[in-house]
A protein has these predicted regions:
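Conserved N-terminal beta1-alpha1 strand-loop-helix module at the mouth
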Residues: 1-76, 148-174
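N-terminal small/glycine-rich loop or linker at the start of catalytic domains
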Residues: 5-25, 126-151, 188-197
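Hydrophobic faces of well-ordered beta-strands that scaffold small-molecule active sites
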Residues: 16-22, 52-54, 78-80, 95-97, ...
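Glycine-rich phosphate-binding active-site loops on the catalytic face of alpha/beta enzymes
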Residues: 53-59, 94, 98-109, 179-182, ...
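Alpha-helix-loop-beta-strand connector modules within alpha/beta enzyme cores
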Residues: 63-84, 116-128, 185-211, 241-246
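Alpha-helical segments flanking ligand/cofactor-binding loops in enzyme cores
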Residues: 68, 165, 193, 216-217
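Catalytic cores of alpha/beta
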Residues: 80, 84-97, 198-228
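Conserved anion-binding
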Residues: 87-168
Length: 246
């Protein structure tokens, strides 16, 4: 079963999913051991609801080594969450092939994809095309700075939902609503709900989620998979309480 098939099966069965986002430039050996221990102690028998995302907006080093290290520590699937074409590791289980559909910067709509396409195809790594939509999280985020694009305002849920639908019609397999790393607030429930009603494909939501209640609010609004990263970087002891919500 592919990673995408696994996600679809969970969505169809109503099983919610969680991804821990690891930024290789921000994780120490001690932190990684701690969070992997928590993940392994919480995981279900088949790991089907858990994922490790690896990536960041400003990575400068190769991610191959960190992916290899994580895969030695857990059987949970490792999925690349790349900020650009250089952030590709052929030892990952899958790759989110992100297109920044909320922006109009061609570099992140298609140019980075062209640059990485041959390496991805030759590697054989599963590639999951994903429409990536930035939503205002109340502060300037790294992805805004790097991509030179602005997030959609939370006052226009229809625009966000329509963009998600356009993404689906373009052939993207998933939609990712992103408030940004370290956002002051997560993606609002009404935006998640409107987007969920507009699309049939899996819906990922990340950015600004810090508590089990915020996670459950996103799930109840229609998110299929929640991504948490920045908060766990500074509060690794809270990971178990989030995983317990699955």
């Amino acid at each position: 079963m592919t990673i995408y098939d696994q996600i679809l099966a969970n969505k169809t069965a109503g099983r919610k999913m969680f991804a821990l986002l690891i930024d290789p430039e921000k994780c120490s050996e001690e932190w990684l051991c701690q969070v992997m221990s928590t993940v392994n102690s919480q995981q279900s028998t088949d790991n089907s609801q858990l994922f490790i995302f690896v990536g960041g907006s400003q990575l400068k080093e190769s991610v191959f080594d960190i992916v290899e290290k994580i895969k030695r520590m857990t059987t949970v699937p490792v999925v690349m969450f790349p900020g650009d074409a250089s952030q590709f590791a052929e030892n990952a289980d899958a790759l989110l092939f992100l297109s920044l559909v909320s922006g109009r910067n061609a570099k992140y709509l298609i140019e980075q994809h062209i640059e990485a396409s041959r390496a991805i195809k030759s590697s054989g790594v599963e590639c999951i095309s994903t429409g990536y939509i930035l939503v205002d999280g109340g502060k300037l985020t790294a992805v805004e700075r790097v991509s030179h694009t602005s997030p959609y305002p939370t006052t226009n849920p229809q625009l966000i939902a329509d963009t998600a639908l356009a993404s689906q019609l373009l052939g993207h397999k998933m939609v990712y609503l992103e408030a940004g790393s370290g956002a002051n607030r997560p993606v609002p429930q009404n935006i998640i709900s409107e987007t969920r009603k507009a699309i049939d494909i899996p819906l990922i939501v990340g950015g600004g989620i810090k508590t089990p209640q915020q996670m459950m609010d996103a799930f109840s609004a229609g998110a299929d998979l929640i991504v948490v990263g920045n908060h766990i970087e500074s509060h690794p002891d809270t990971l178990a309480s989030l995983l317990n919500q699955l």
